């Protein structure tokens, strides 16, 4: 991934605005430390801060079409780029080996709707010189971050950037650009291009679970995400989701390393034929112990890192600066991920696989055990998936990209979502003694199939859900709460700020994070934040920690 900035129809002289644009783009350089680029056409400027993963030597951006009339700045990876190149009708002269260059010619042949043809994670802005317009698009789920800004001083100017910090100095209104949409400045319309069969949360599927299909679709998703020309690894917490991704990745890495094929998959081999795994936690935390066991089982080159509570607290302001949120759940989980990402990047790794999305797809958060019906269970799953760009995707993207590390999330593959969200929700529910994410566990349980090698140790495969902020060590959350008590007095807590409106923090911890956020960001940035809380209507505690949910408490008795 990278950092992008685009400003269309600049109100002032473009050359006079250029230094300001470059300064704004510089705020994103942590996302792309490898190179900086810009392109100016008429009154439009596109900037790019590059993290080179594919097309390392030739893929500098912005990308320009063979006739010079289309200019593109992209943050993301297009996994089907080779097939898309082959299917182009025209005979185009590609200038790079970048996976993103194909977007230029897809747009030429199909217009803005070409976004629906892309299999990957992406945010991009394209300038069409003939029509003097821009088109912006974001991937279906919002794995990559993208914001759109507006200025009352120049209402005809369109602003786009990967992060808020590149927009708030010049925009007085900012929105999170909706996933699965494209924007066309010619019509000034934002159009939803992503229309999967599962989108209507009131349409309840009735398909029985096909365990083989579920397993093979996830394996295919991991395989395509190994596309890289740089060393990669996996984030391994020792929980079900990250452990499954690590297991599949280890198999695929070994398979590719031993292959003599020149297929698309074979070209993803890096300098490391053995998979590297990375874990973090407080000393002695549940995640570290479980991750170590998984790494031993998979024979990965395992890197275990610890942090102290003081180190986590010291990083908190930086975490809020990079995450651009005050949501309690996101900040709790992002802090160890942020610290781990720094360690990983220092070890020469640029890309990791991560396990985000599984809990939303399969109802893995323990509060789902309170779902009153299959209909309610499914609707909540779909709602959570639709809002991932405001929570876990935001965390996975910004925690890692703070250090120029790219995170890829196989569970959010379009094909996998199509399979998993069309399963009868009753198959996912916590009934008849079933654990959370039962069908996912069952799909990778080889106990009764001697033709398959085990994916994971049984006690890991059937380990109860621990949210990342819990698994790194329960004392981490306790320390955050205790520190908030010291930082926020009872008198201050009783007088929330008027500008917060109805978004009033209900705990001192939430109040503290909002206060820190306001010290860093101007008021308009708060409109992009959504707080993650369990389903109150289901009788769930408001604290998002999994250990406060009934299922976790019952399991400990």
Swiss-Prot record:
Its EC number is 6.3.5.4. The keyword Protease does not apply. Keywords: Amino-acid biosynthesis, Asparagine biosynthesis, ATP-binding, Cytoplasm, Glutamine amidotransferase, Ligase, Nucleotide-binding, Nucleus, Phosphoprotein. One of its GO terms (biological process) is asparagine biosynthetic process. It catalyses: L-aspartate + L-glutamine + ATP + H2O = L-asparagine + L-glutamate + AMP + diphosphate + H(+). Residues 196-531 form the Asparagine synthetase domain. One of its GO terms (cellular component) is cytosol. GO terms for molecular function: asparagine synthase (glutamine-hydrolyzing) activity; ATP binding. This is Probable asparagine synthetase [glutamine-hydrolyzing]. It comes from Schizosaccharomyces pombe (strain 972 / ATCC 24843) (Fission yeast).
């Amino acid at each position: 991934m990278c950092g992008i900035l685009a400003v269309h129809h600049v109100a002032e002289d473009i050359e006079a605005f250029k230094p300001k644009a470059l300064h704004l783009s510089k705020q994103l350089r942590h996302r792309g430390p490898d190179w900086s680029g810009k392109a100016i056409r008429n009154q439009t400027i596109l900037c790019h801060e590059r993290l080179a993963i594919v097309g390392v030597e030739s893929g500098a951006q912005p990308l320009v079409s063979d006739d010079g009339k289309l200019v593109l700045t992209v943050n993301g990876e297009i996994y089907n780029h080779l097939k898309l190149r082959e299917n182009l009708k025209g005979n185009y002269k590609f200038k790079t080996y970048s996976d993103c260059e194909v977007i230029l010619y897809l747009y030429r042949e199909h217009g803005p709707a070409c976004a629906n043809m892309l299999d990957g994670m992406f945010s991009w802005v394209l300038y069409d010189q003939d029509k003097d317009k821009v088109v912006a698009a974001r991937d279906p789920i919002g794995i990559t971050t993208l914001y759109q800004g507006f200025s009352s001083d120049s209402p005809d100017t369109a602003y786009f950037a990967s992060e808020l910090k590149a927009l708030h100095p010049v925009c007085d209104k900012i929105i999170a650009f909706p996933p699965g949409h494209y924007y066309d400045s010619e019509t000034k319309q934002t159009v939803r291009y992503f229309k999967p069969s599962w989108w209507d949360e009131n349409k309840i599927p009735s398909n029985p679970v096909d365990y083989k299909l579920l397993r093979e679709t996830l394996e295919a998703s991991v395989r395509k995400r190994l596309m890289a020309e740089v060393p990669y690894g996996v984030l391994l917490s020792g929980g079900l989701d990250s452990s499954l991704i690590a297991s599949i990745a280890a198999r695929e890495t070994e398979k590719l390393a031993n292959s003599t094929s020149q297929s698309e998959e074979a070209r993803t081999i890096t300098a490391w034929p053995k998979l590297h795994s990375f874990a973090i936690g407080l000393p002695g935390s549940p995640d570290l112990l479980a991750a170590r066991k998984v790494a031993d089982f998979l024979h990965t080159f395992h890197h275990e890192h610890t942090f102290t509570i003081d180190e986590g607290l010291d990083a908190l302001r930086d975490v809020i600066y990079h995450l651009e949120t005050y949501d309690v759940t996101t900040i709790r989980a992002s802090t160890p991920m942020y610290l781990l990402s720094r360690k990983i990047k220092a070890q020469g790794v640029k890309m990791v696989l991560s396990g985000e999305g599984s809990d939303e797809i399969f109802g893995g958060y323990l509060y789902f055990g309170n779902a009153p019906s299959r209909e309610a269970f499914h609707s909540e799953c779909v709602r959570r998936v639709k809002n991932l760009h405001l929570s876990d995707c935001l965390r996975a993207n910004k925690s890692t990209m703070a250090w120029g590390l790219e995170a890829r999330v196989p569970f959010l593959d379009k094909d996998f979502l199509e399979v998993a969200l069309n399963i009868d929700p009753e198959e996912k529910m916590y009934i008849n003694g079933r654990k959370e994410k039962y069908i996912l566990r069952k799909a990778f349980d080889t106990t009764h199939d001697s033709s398959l090698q085990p994916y994971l140790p049984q006690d890991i495969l059937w380990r109860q859900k621990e949210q990342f902020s819990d698994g790194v060590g329960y004392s981490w959350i306790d320390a955050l709460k205790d520190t908030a008590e010291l930082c926020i007095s009872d008198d201050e807590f009783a007088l929330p700020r008027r500008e917060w409106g109805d978004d009033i923090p209900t705990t001192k911890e939430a109040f503290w994070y909002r206060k820190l956020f306001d010290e860093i960001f101007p008021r308009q940035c708060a409109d992009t934040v959504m707080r993650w809380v369990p389903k109150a209507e289901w009788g769930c505690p408001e604290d998002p920690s999994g250990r406060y949910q009934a299922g976790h408490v019952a399991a400990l008795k």
